[in-house]
Amino acid sequence: GSMAAGGLSFADLLRAEAEQGVGSSHKALINIHLSGGPSHQDTFDLKPDAASEFRGEFAPIQTNVPGLDICEHFPKLAQHGDKFAVVRSIFGNIADHSDHHTQTGFDRKSLSGIGGRPSIGSVAAHLLGSVNGAPPFVGYNGSWPGYLGAVYKPYKPQGGNLKLSGSMTSDRLASRTSLLKDLDGLKRAADNSGQMDALDAYTQQAVDVVTSGRVADALDLNNEDQKIRDKYTKDGESFLRARRLVEAGVRVVGFNWGGWDTHSNNFVTLKRQLPKLDVALASLFEDLHQRGMDQDTTVVVWGEFGR
């Protein structure tokens, strides 16, 4: 949970992970949530043999995998059918736009008495730890640590101060961090909640992020080849940043990609949305494959209601 679970301190957990070689693993997850819940029968699970009032107006096209057909507005993804699987067994039993349900698999009230269920990224951060000083979980969507404790909250980059600047050196930063620990010592003696342990982890994570510069470099798309940026397009920059963050050592990157709540004008909206998703997702699959990251990186694309 927080840093005192099972009698283990955060340092103990990190030490145990190092001994088990957990920290050397480069397995990663890119969790893309299509906020609003895209219509499955108009995207990856078309029903061409159903009656016209059920099947929708889009036609299926064949991918490079025999028997796997997807929407006609996914021509680029159709060339990468061998790089993804369509999972049709997922279902949703909550009739609202609950990102909590998609991120945890449980109702919001589940285990609420002890903090609630943790999201996918928080579980991965707890089990896998960090790599190369990068935060294990970067989340731009609705994610929370639940009963695992505050230390497993997602890291949410905000602002531009992600690198050392001006006269601030690594030594000066270390000195200030040491002073902060001394000042916190008075509070620690009276703390029984684990909050100080969590604060230690936050501080160390912030120091690691600032001193290494890896996360700042990954987030700055000016460091990316312009041809790659053009391939993803402006609409696909979140996908590109996710790939760069994984390369920097982040275990889980989660973000929302909205615009899928199509109660009205479904087909008009999808004709606008689907080509953007086609370009961004196909570019991500292609990139991961070309960079040798495809065997270690899982990409999940989904929305509410089991879609």
Please tell me what each predicted stretch does.
Residues 1-307:
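Ligand-binding pockets and gating/stacking loops
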